Swiss-Prot record:
GO terms for cellular component: cytoplasm. It catalyses: cytidine(1402) in 16S rRNA + S-adenosyl-L-methionine = N(4)-methylcytidine(1402) in 16S rRNA + S-adenosyl-L-homocysteine + H(+). The keyword DNA damage does not apply. It comes from Rhizobium etli (strain ATCC 51251 / DSM 11541 / JCM 21823 / NBRC 15573 / CFN 42). One of its GO terms (biological process) is rRNA base methylation. It comes from the Bacteria. InterPro entries: RsmH, SAM-dep_MeTrfase_MraW_recog, SAM-dependent_MTases_sf. Specifically methylates the N4 position of cytidine in position 1402 (C1402) of 16S rRNA. This is Ribosomal RNA small subunit methyltransferase H.
Amino acid sequence: MVTNPGGGSTDAGGGPVRHIPVLLNEVLAALSPAPGKLILDGTFGAGGYSAAILAAGAEVIALDRDPSAIAAGQAMVAAHAGRLRLIHAQFSNLGDHAPQGGLDGVVLDIGVSSMQIDEPERGFSFQKSGPLDMRMSATGVSAADVVNRAKVADLIRIFHFLGEENQAPRIAHAIEKRREEKPFETTRDLAGLIELVTPRKMKDKIHPATRVFQALRIFVNDELGELAQALFAAERTLKPGGRLVVVTFHSLEDRIVKKFFSDRAGRATGSRHLPAAHERAATFTAIGKPMVSASEAEAEANPRARSAKLRAGLRTDAAAEAADMSLFGFPNLASLGKLGG
């Protein structure tokens, strides 16, 4: 998966680039698939990870919230004679599709997929004009709904927190003024306004609309909430010795994964001022280095790998802890809800 909403995946000749699984060797090393093991791939996409896991002899349960990914994956299902189950589902609900404490591994590749970015009609990229949609599935509010109906204060919160956009107030007020005249309908429409009110400077490496598009996509698909719930579900479904491997592409996602593994490493409750009443048993221990990033060679061959970070944990035999969303400290932006209505 990738995060750059500018999209534009082309090779040197200008043609489309085939989907290349990011950090594939590192994922396999951390996941350790083998015959007799059951691995859940929570983000099937184009099937890159699933194919490699199957090639190692393991069985795979694969999930994807995008109906087009499920349709495209049917040929792979047919080719693997009962060793691959492909299910249309969000990875936050992975516990509904796997035996409790029965998985040997879970792999999550967070963010929008290359295929989604490369399809203008999905509305993820501003490089080609398409409907302002950004939904990974066909349900829920679209990016156009948010841009055209959300209160200015809510737009500012979304752009600032989910996009880390310093110009959030200026952009939000410009959106409000423009939508009174005409609603936003296309990706180019919104990107053009953002570029007008926050023009690109010579030192800027990204398009002025990049962070706003990222924020809208994350909000529309509740990506941070989905990730947090998937981590809790993986904790419940992995057997002792099972492996959780997560690949992220921007700092907000990585912060959640890092916080989860740090919290689940086990420590005494309390502080030096208030002695702990008991030790918390670790539910995960680290696998290898705390964080792995792409090699320079991979980043050169696949620029989308440059921002990727991998974190992995080994499940202990301690009981799973409560799923407490307050652990991550981010506001419940999904509750903004009424979009000004």
